[in-house]
């Protein structure tokens, strides 16, 4: 269930923790937000100096300390009326708080009700929301109604709508919409540093939300993840239609519902493809998705052993013991099983593997996608082999023709070669919004030309 041992992802760039690809990746994930307000390099370096590899408690302590320091700076700045400094520090405090709980998302056992997770999620959200009034866009908190089943009572999914400021809106006054879905372990406050901050500056309204199995919805409402994400995004789109009508009527703002796109990375890339089966989605950006989660989860387990298990010759208890031994020896595997335990509500490794079979694009699902699609892979991915996943996705989109499907497959870290484009957020936004501008007919001219 882990990425390949000896992954060469960090062979060409600096390692904060030599030989520990997982920790290096997660540190770079935090540092990647620095240009967009989520991290300060000196605070970052101070924190990682206090972290011991594969030790979730020193990780939590270091980032909690950084978060507290940034929060103090923010409150002092706010008291002085320096809203820009307060905004920046609140964003960093939120980012570090998210990071603090990341490695210990579960307890020392497979306890999906870890009492430490919810306070971290709430604090991450609260600090981020203190920064919202001072962003250089119109950022709004929304609640999106969602019914887990046809007959269940609706619950609300928390979301943000980032509306471009007047000076950043497109000349025709209409605002295209980008729906940004999260994935397995991100929270929507972290997503801000990638597509929302870049989108509103380019004239796009960007909507983020947390669905079942994600962020505070998992920890506060107890809703577990589901494979048919098109059901979730379908309800988000239903809400958007009413929300856009209200904005038009009350404020004269025009969200262009004929130009709605969806984007997600890693598991979010899989979710984006599921969402794109809805005809209301007119463009899809699937960043480094998986094609079949079962194939990913079992790729480093003997095929004969797995065949014996699925054929009934090996018991679930044996599978649990084998994976349990691996968890004892490998922190990354222990963390991965803990994460899936949390978002699926399943405590047995054998049951987790079975659940993975439900998360697949096999069976011709992508034939339902009719909009232009941008697909990327990561040549130095920590998790997904590009041939097994990216190219299978791209191949299943052949019905779109070469003009309506786009493939980007970078290999080096600085080119976007790490999973989810960690370390290359600026570059992925250049590619993503270039693609969307082309699909939606957005023409940009230099100010001097106008």
From Swiss-Prot:
InterPro entries: AB_hydrolase_1, AB_hydrolase_fold, FrsA_esterase. It is an enzyme of class 3 (hydrolase). The active site is at 266 (nucleophile). SUPFAM superfamilies: alpha/beta-Hydrolases. Keywords: Hydrolase. Pathway: Mycotoxin biosynthesis. This is Hydrolase ffsE. It comes from Aspergillus flavipes. The gene is ffsE.
């Amino acid at each position: 269930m882990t990425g390949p041992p000896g992954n060469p992802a960090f062979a060409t760039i600096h390692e904060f923790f030599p030989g520990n690809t997982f920790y290096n990746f997660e540190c770079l994930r935090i540092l990647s937000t620095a240009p967009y307000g989520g991290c300060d390099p000196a605070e970052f370096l101070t924190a990682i100096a206090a972290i011991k590899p594969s030790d979730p408690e020193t990780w939590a302590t270091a980032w909690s300390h950084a978060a507290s320091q940034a929060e103090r700076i923010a409150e002092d700045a706010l008291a002085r009326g320096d809203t820009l400094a307060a905004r920046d520090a609140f964003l960093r405090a939120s980012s570090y708080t998210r990071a603090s709980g990341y490695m210990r998302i579960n307890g020392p056992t497979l306890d999906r009700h870890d009492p430490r997770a919810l306070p971290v999620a709430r604090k991450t959200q609260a600090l981020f929301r203190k920064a919202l009034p001072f962003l250089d866009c119109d950022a709004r908190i929304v609640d999106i109604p969602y019914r887990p089943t046809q007959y269940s009572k609706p619950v609300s999914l928390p979301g943000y709508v980032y509306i471009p400021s007047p000076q950043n809106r497109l000349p025709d006054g209409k605002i295209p919409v980008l729906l940004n879905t999260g994935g397995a372990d991100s929270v929507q406050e972290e997503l801000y540093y990638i597509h929302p901050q870049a989108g509103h500056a380019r004239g796009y309204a960007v909507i983020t939300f947390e669905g079942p199995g994600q962020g505070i919805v998992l920890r506060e409402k107890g809703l577990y993840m589901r494979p048919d994400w098109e059901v979730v995004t379908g309800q988000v789109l239903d809400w958007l239609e009413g929300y856009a009508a209200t904005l038009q009527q009350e404020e004269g703002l025009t969200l262009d519902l004929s130009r709605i796109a969806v984007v997600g990375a890693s598991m979010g890339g899989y979710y984006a493809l599921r969402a794109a089966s809805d005809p209301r989605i007119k463009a899809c950006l699937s960043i480094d998705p998986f094609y079949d989660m079962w194939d990913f989860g079992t790729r480093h387990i003997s095929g004969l052993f797995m065949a014996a298990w699925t054929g009934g010759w090996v018991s679930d208890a044996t599978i649990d013991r084998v994976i349990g031994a691996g968890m004892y020896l490998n922190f990354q595997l222990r963390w991965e099983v803990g994460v899936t335990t949390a978002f699926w509500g399943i405590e047995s490794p054998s049951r987790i593997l079975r659940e993975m079979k439900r998360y697949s694009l096999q069976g011709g699902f992508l034939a339902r996608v009719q909009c232009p699609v941008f697909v990327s892979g990561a040549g130095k991915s920590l998790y997904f082999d590009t041939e097994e996943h990216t190219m299978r996705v791209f191949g299943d989109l052949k019905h779109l023709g070469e003009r309506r499907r786009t493939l980007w497959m970078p290999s080096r870290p600085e080119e976007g070669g790490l999973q989810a484009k960690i370390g290359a957020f600026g570059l992925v936004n250049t590619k993503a919004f270039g693609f969307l501008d082309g699909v939606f007919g957005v023409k940009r001219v230099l100010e001097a030309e106008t």
